[in-house]
């Protein structure tokens, strides 16, 4: 699975349109009791999935600020996947792209939004139960960009028994000094304070115990 992540990084740009695409299912959804709403996701199945009994490794892809369609629309990830498989550089795998909203893929400190709980307790088991996946640590990986990079590191570090590898591309992470000094206050409150606590605070008062538990 680590080889898959490496090649995806190398091939995320410069893909031409000459390759047939794997099975691409966009606009799928799952109801989340933790979030109390439907959560959209896309899933890309390797060519030949429908005609085999193989169990495939799964790559979960966390997007940055924006929405979950950006990996497919701008990142060409389905073409990347298909090209690498056809060239024999990697073995076939399943790609899952959930809508992460602006959650940083974290549970909020006050319990008002439980995205990590949804991902770990609901989405991963749902994918394992409804698709032919490898259900072991070496069969699951996460890759994330920006906000998704933060989430990939944060989620995988607290759930090491589930994920065998992780890649964070330009992750939205801060040193403690940057976190304490970042402004303007309203922007910090909306981006960080609402998730990790410390709304309206400055300096070391922003370094809540909840933030320290979740910051990569």
Give residue spans per PLM region.
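Sec-dependent N-terminal signal peptides
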Residues: 4-14
């Amino acid at each position: 699975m680590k080889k898959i992540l490496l090649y995806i990084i190398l091939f995320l740009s410069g893909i031409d349109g000459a390759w047939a695409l794997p099975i691409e299912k966009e606009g799928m959804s799952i109801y989340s009791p933790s979030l109390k709403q439907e959560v959209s996701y896309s899933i890309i199945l390797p060519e030949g999935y429908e005609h085999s009994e193989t169990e495939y490794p799964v790559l979960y892809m966390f997007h940055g600020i924006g929405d979950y369609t950006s990996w497919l629309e701008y990142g060409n990830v389905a073409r990347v996947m298909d090209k690498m498989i056809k060239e024999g550089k990697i073995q076939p795998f399943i790609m899952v792209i959930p809508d992460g909203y602006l959650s940083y893929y974290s549970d909020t400190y006050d319990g008002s939004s439980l995205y990590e709980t949804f991902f770990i307790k609901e989405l991963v088991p749902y994918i394992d139960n409804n698709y032919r996946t490898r259900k072991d640590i070496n069969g699951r990986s996460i890759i994330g960009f920006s906000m998704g990079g933060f989430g990939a590191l944060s989620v995988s570090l607290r759930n090491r028994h589930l994920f065998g590898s992780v890649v964070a591309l330009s992750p939205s992470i801060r040193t403690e000094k940057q976190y304490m000094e970042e402004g303007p206050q309203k922007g910090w409150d909306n981006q960080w304070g609402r998730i990790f606590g410390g709304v309206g605070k400055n300096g070391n008062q922003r370094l809540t115990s909840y933030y320290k538990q979740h910051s990569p």
